[in-house]
Amino acid sequence: MGFPGAYPVSGQTYSRKVDFQVLQVLSGIAQSASKFSSDIRLLSHLKEVDEPFESGQIGSSAMAYKRNPMRSERIASLSRYVICDLQNAAVTASAQWFERTLDDSANRRISIPEAFLATDGILTLYLNVIRGLTVYPKMAEKHLADELPFLATENILMYCVKEKGGDRQALHEAIRQHSVAAGKEIKLNGGRNDLLERILADPIFGLTRAELNKLVDPHAFTGMAVHQTETFLREQVAPVLNKYT
C-alpha cells in the first residue's frame, strides 16, 4: 500500500503508547510556550516589554490605563491544558488490557484532536506576540542600574583584596553592613540605591571614583553572553528558519 513501515506486532489497535509519544511532542511545545509567556508577563509587569496592543483595545472596563498581557495569559492557559492532556494519554496507554480494549475510544477522540487544536492556538498566539513585541531598553537599563551596585559587590571585594591588599573578612563584613543599610533605605523609605556611595566613602576600601566606575561597568558582568547568543542564532536558529522560508 506504499506505507514506509508497519508495527511488527499489533492487536485490534496499535499500542496507545504511540498516542502518548505524539502528545509528548505537543506537550513539549506547550512547555516552551508557557515558559515564554511567563517571561513576557513578568517583563510586562516590570514595564520592560509590551505585547501587541491594538489602538482601540480595552485592558479593563474599570481601569482604563491597564494593558494586561492577555495574549501571553492565553498562551499560559492553553499550554496548561496541553501539558495536562499528556497525562490523559499516559493513563489510557497504561489501562489497556491484554490485546487491548476499546475503552480508550471515546476518550482519545476528544483528547487528541483537542491537543492539536490547542497547540495550534498556542502557536498562533506565540507568533502574534513575537511579531508585535515592543521592548523598552531604557526600562531595562533603569532596573539594571538599581541592582548593579549589589551585583558588583563580589568584584569590588576581589579587587580590593588583590589590588589594595585588604583583609577579605573585614571587607566582606563592611560590604554586608553597607548592603543591609542600602537595602533598608530602599525598602523602608523608598530611597535610591546608595550602596556605591557608601562604599566609596568608607576608607577600608580605598577606592577612587574612577576605580569604582570601572568595577561597576555592566559589560563586565555579561561574560560570554553576546558570543553565545550570536552563535546560537547562527548555528541553531538560522538553519531551521532557512528550512521553512
Q: Where are the model-predicted features located?
A:
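Internal glycine-rich alpha/beta core junctions
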Residues: M1-A95
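Glycine-rich cofactor/substrate-binding loops
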Residues: E48, Y65-T245
